[in-house]
């Protein structure tokens, strides 16, 4: 039983809602679901219910059934869900170090962090 499950499933008729209530029930109550594949692989309604019933369960989502994620979607207000703006890709470590360092220094100086998720814009 894994602490972390990463979904990289494509969007096919066989993978639609693959991660549903039945799948989630089999996971540890204190685990993390990461979806970087395609949004329709995760049943969003089932995920919300599962998190509500299992407060130690978390999800990190880069893809959704509908993109961009609508402003009133329940994911935005759920503290157990981390949303990333559909940026999963191969990382160039040399360039990412400078990128992260700059943002960290801005954070330390209480400056606005550039390129963060803007809930008002929906991404």
What residues fall within each predicted segment?
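C-terminal helix-to-coil terminal segments
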Residues: 67-123
